[in-house]
């Protein structure tokens, strides 16, 4: 662990061709491919810092469902990378949440990118896309930005 804070940003995206169904619910893996366009001016920015206590904390107000989803995601990626450190999370969108603009996609992509930077994991974009997908299927596309085609595969 070489950093004590990391900030990352990711764009929302809009699917031009949506995926249908899931090949794996556990890994949030789509059954079919998809094509999207990154909405580069609509972004989520997330900052992660080491928490001082034994729980993750948020600067941002989240409803219970969103909080549980984010905490479950963090627990899973911490376990996958054998990291015990608890985090303080600050996250904000520069666009309205819950309006169909894929804020969960940009949110989980930004969270994945910040986690990678904080713990100096140096994951390849394709691996970061798989990590982000655990939080939101569309986040796999937001990791890349721009025009993205994701092809359904075994992983």
Q: What function would you assign to each model-found segment?
A:
Residues 107, 111, 122-130:
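Histidine/cysteine- and/or acidic
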